[in-house]
Amino acid sequence: MSKLHDFLNEAGIFYLATADDDQPKVRPLGAHVEEDGKEYFTVGDFKEVYRQMVKNPRVEIVAFEPKTRRWLRYTGKVVFVDSPSVEEKIFQELPHLRQMYNDETGYKMKIFTLEDATAKILDMQGNVEELELK
């Protein structure tokens, strides 16, 4: 597992920042999986966050790990992917999502990763650890 993935697991909940025209929007997320050294996330196709990312794919993910009092900044460009294996991994880890994303509801899960990305772990003393991303 990568340091990025481990940090997100430790934090549990992380926050995704997008732009709605000139207004920043931030919301909590928790779904993520790692495959082939890349981190993948998911949002619903029926949500504003999805439309915001389509319009402006530059986003930032921030997570805070309370035990160490460190936080993660993961910034990059959203790229949506069609990956049945990642989708299945997400459903295995979060089976309740099958109740939301299915043919009956008509809602689709949109899977994304970040490209041209940087990731840093920071602490309150100003220390910065740059993470190597695949």
Language-model features: locations:
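Acidic-histidine catalytic/liganding microenvironments
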Residues: 11, 56, 94
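Hydrophobic/aromatic beta-strand elements that line small-molecule binding cavities or substrate pockets
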Residues: 29-32, 76-78
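A short mixed-secondary-structure module that forms the rim of ligand-binding clefts
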Residues: 32-68
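Charged, gly/pro-rich active-site loop segments
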Residues: 73-134
